[in-house]
């Protein structure tokens, strides 16, 4: 089995779970644009981990909206990204 076949099989599996890549990309980019515009309009300077967590949360929300909303892993990942930032803030640590 070739690498191309393996990749195509993987992509087909992902599409059945998350919907089309194009649909996901559209939703994800709209969410990210709104978040980044809102932060900029309010002069919010977020730390790199906060920005990345928000981007990853937007990615997971897009997967939920474009694909299977009952796939628990997406919801768990959202909680995980938020928890990573919250733990760093609660410890009083500065972002790297």
Regions found by a protein language model. Give the residues of each.
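Intrinsically disordered, low-complexity regulatory regions
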Residues: 1-96
């Amino acid at each position: 089995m070739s690498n191309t076949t393996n990749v195509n099989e993987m992509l087909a599996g992902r599409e059945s779970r998350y919907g089309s890549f194009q649909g996901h990309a559209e939703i994800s980019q709209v969410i990210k644009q709104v978040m980044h515009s809102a932060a900029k309009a309010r002069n919010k300077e977020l730390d790199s981990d906060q920005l990345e967590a928000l981007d990853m949360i937007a990615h997971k929300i897009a997967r939920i909206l474009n694909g299977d909303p009952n796939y628990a892993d997406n919801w768990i990942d959202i909680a995980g990204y938020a928890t990573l930032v919250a733990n760093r803030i609660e410890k009083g640590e500065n972002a790297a």
